[in-house]
Amino acid sequence: MKRVLSTSLSVALATGLYGISFGAIGVAAGLDVLSVMLLSLLMFSGASQFAFVGVVSAGGAPITAIASAWLMGVRNSFYALRLAPEFGPRGLMRFLQAQLTIDESNAVSAAQVGSSDRKLGFWLTGIGVFTFWNLATLLGAIGGNLIGSVEAWGLDAAAAAAFLGLLWPRLRENLPLAFAGGIVALAAVPFLPAGLPILLAAAVALLPIGRKK
């Protein structure tokens, strides 16, 4: 139990602190503190949140931002399929587990041996990340407001940079597909509203380009 607790706490703290970046970047994208906090409280998926503010900062339509966030968060559904048979949540616990089903809680849970440790790892990590992430988001959002002009500090480009940072490890796994998506997105920029090119690039990811057989 001590090992699970230690692992969960360290993962939760390290991941949660990254929320400072999201808070500051969300404000830089033009959102107010309340909107930034609602994203962390309700959406609670780092990649999806960065995708959302990335589209917003580029001037994209809200529906495009929502679609981008959904595409980034769809993997959590597959985590839920793995966890549901063992956890078997009912009632309100089902909604709580769904909210806490993220990369970190799934990873810590999967690394444990016994069923009780897997459940403990999931809940401790999920609750820990949720707590630290939201506290850090608040600090980042308030700090972003105190900075003043985000353009003067170069933070207006931070959302796109953070989004790319999240994607880069996966892009390296299939460079031909990444380049194809990039070319499609760049070609679409002059003709489509902001935010739609990235959705076209995501569609390219479904093509069998450069995949290992």
What is the predicted function of each stretch?
Residues I66-D156:
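Helix-loop-helix junctions within the multi-pass membrane cores of secondary transporters/permeases
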Residues G210-K213:
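Membrane-interface capping segments at transmembrane-helix boundaries
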